From Swiss-Prot:
The species this protein was found in: Chaetomium globosum (strain ATCC 6205 / CBS 148.51 / DSM 1962 / NBRC 6347 / NRRL 1970)
Functional description taken from the UniProt entry: Transcription factor that regulates the expression of the gene cluster that mediates the biosynthesis of the tetramic acid Sch210972, a potential anti-HIV fungal natural product that contains a decalin core.
Cellular location(s): Nucleus
Comp. bias regions, Low complexity: 238-249
Keyword Transmembrane carried by entry: no
Name assigned to this protein: Transcription factor cghF
UniProt KW rRNA-binding keyword: no
Region (Disordered), start-end ranges: 232-283
Superkingdom: Eukaryota
Length: 528
């Protein structure tokens, strides 16, 4: 449990915040600084411009005529639809382009006859397309953010007026797009943007998406394939929720599909019947597992990664010039997922209680994974900037990816503190210590850049400032940054929803330019 101004929050043992709390040297210092901070407002937001989930808070007073009147001109919507299907890569997995185009034409012929939910689906397509536009294509970034909020309102209004809780065609598809939009906007690992998933999953189950359509002869092969594609995002999202929200998983792959009865006899089971507990996710398992089992799982993980199709295996960018940015981002996602699982498997054996030689492999595995995560964070920052190989794919960054970077940073800090104090003389790979120290130093400007719009980034920057290994190595940019900003500009006047690029970030770029150039020169990018 972690104490905050709003009370206590629960974090699972594999969450980055739990790892940070294990660093004894930083706990007292950060607690003192937490007391000195001003109380957080009731809504808990840093930037008041960042809304909560509109589906949970938005009252609906508009009529269908008012909603349709707010629809952009068809020429504009045509461009947004084209961008959605051509740029996302993920969107066509839940919407069939030819089928959507037919319904799209029918909408423009008679908008009043179109169901509310389909209108909401169209607004969700427009909303995501606006989020993924390139800076400079349209008006200022701030006006883009305002339009996104307006489209969020329309999506919610259409869902409510269409009585989405009763299910129906395109309800789940609209919810998938809506949740994706919310998660792309959020900067922190707050629970709020994930709450709509708690609505989406039961809706998907009520529509039978948790069952394979092959067993239902009345569902055509085409409809069955589309149902499988629509069912994938809710399943993946619910498995990702614990990573981003600090909570144990509440949805397991064993739950949706019922198993066969244990007995074919008509006698019912009673309260006295004893049966084995269902299997549990290892990350949420409260019981100790034998160390040989952990090593076996680690080997299985390596085997699975090796068995991936070549197109999805991570290769250095120097060997990937001809690979589309979307594929590169998928490769990066998969590699980060593997590194996160490595930490989940071995994080427990970083503790001083496991200082014996047999556990050295786990300590080294965590250190290597944390170092590689930090290198990926730096790589992603460089390549999503204008001119980078991943600039067109920068929209694919989200709070889920940031939580992986936070986990890597936390484990790296813990490993540095552990090998310096709790395990003196053990694991003293000085080259590894220097590499991790340098990467933590290099990522500090990135956390500081996002600290104006992200509580998690602000905490990460604060923890790095307090890390003994980095004392005297971090540039003093706070005073220079405040000198370049006008009074009262703690919240940037405009910020890129993907990078947080407003006055705060531009001033930080000016202050840290030399440091960035030095990092580009010294970093071993060939390894990444």
């Amino acid at each position: 449990m972690r104490e905050h101004s709003h009370g206590a929050n629960y974090v699972s043992s594999v969450h980055w915040a739990a790892v940070l709390d294990s660093i004894s040297e930083l706990i007292d210092q950060c607690q003192e600084k937490e007391k000195e901070k001003k109380p957080v407002p009731e809504d808990g937001s840093i930037a008041p411009q960042i809304p909560g989930p509109r589906l949970l808070y938005e009252p609906v007073k508009e009529t269908k005529a008012e909603i349709l009147a707010s629809m952009p001109a068809r020429t504009v919507v045509d461009r947004m639809v084209a961008r959605y299907f051509n740029a996302l890569g993920i969107a066509p997995a839940i919407l069939h382009s030819a089928q959507f185009l037919r319904e799209y034409e029918s909408f423009w012929k008679d908008p009043d006859a179109t169901p509310f939910v389909w209108i909401g689906l169209l607004f969700s397509v427009i909303c995501l397309a606006v989020q993924f536009q390139q800076p400079g294509e349209e008006a200022a970034e701030w006006s883009s953010l305002m339009r996104i909020r307006q489209f969020h309102d329309r999506i919610v209004q259409c869902l409510v007026l269409g009585q989405y809780t009763r299910g129906g065609p395109y309800v789940v598809e609209t919810m998938v797009n809506y949740c994706a939009s919310e998660l792309c906007i959020t900067k922190d690992t707050d629970v709020g943007p994930w709450l709509p998933l708690g609505i989406m999953v039961p809706l998907a189950v009520s529509r039978g998406y948790h069952r394979d359509p092959a067993g239902f002869p009345n569902i055509s092969p085409f409809a069955g394939e589309m149902r499988r594609r629509v069912a994938t995002p809710p399943n993946h999202a619910t498995s990702s929720t614990p990573t981003s929200t600090r909570t144990p998983p509440t949805y397991h792959p064993h739950g949706p599909r019922p198993k066969s009865p244990l007995s074919s006899t008509p006698s019912p089971r009673t309260e006295s019947t004893k049966s084995a507990a269902p299997s549990r996710d290892l990350a949420a398992d409260a019981h100790d597992r034998p160390y040989p089992e952990i090593l076996a799982l680690d080997k299985d993980l390596q085997t699975i990664e090796t068995s991936l199709p070549p197109i999805f295996r991570w290769q250095p960018l120097s060997q990937s010039f001809m690979v589309p940015g979307q594929v590169l981002m998928f490769r990066l996602w998969l590699r980060l997922a593997v590194l996160r699982l490595v930490i989940w498997l071995h994080r427990k054996y970083l503790a001083p209680a496991y200082s014996a030689a047999p556990y050295a492999y786990s300590r080294a595995a965590c250190a290597r994974a944390a170092l590689e995560i930090a290198e990926f964070q730096l790589l992603l920052h460089e390549e999503t900037r204008p001119g980078g190989q991943l600039h067109q794919m920068r929209w694919m960054q989200s709070s889920l990816m940031q939580s992986t970077f936070l986990l890597g940073m936390s484990v790296a800090c813990y490993w540095m503190q552990l090998t310096r104090t709790a395990l003196p003389g053990a694991d003293q790979d000085m080259e590894m210590r220097e590499r991790i120290r340098d990467r933590l130093r290099d990522t500090y400007p990135l956390w500081l850049r996002c600290s104006a719009v992200s509580r998690d980034a602000r905490e990460a920057a604060e923890r790095l400032r307090q890390l003994p290994d980095l004392q005297g190595l971090l540039p003093d940019v706070e005073g220079q940054l405040s000198a370049q900003e006008s009074p009262g500009s703690g919240v940037p006047a405009c910020w890129d929803i993907f990078h947080g690029t407003g006055r705060h970030a531009r001033a930080l770029d000016a202050v840290l330019g030399d440091m960035d150039r030095s990092r580009k020169t010294n970093a071993d990018w060939a390894r990444v």
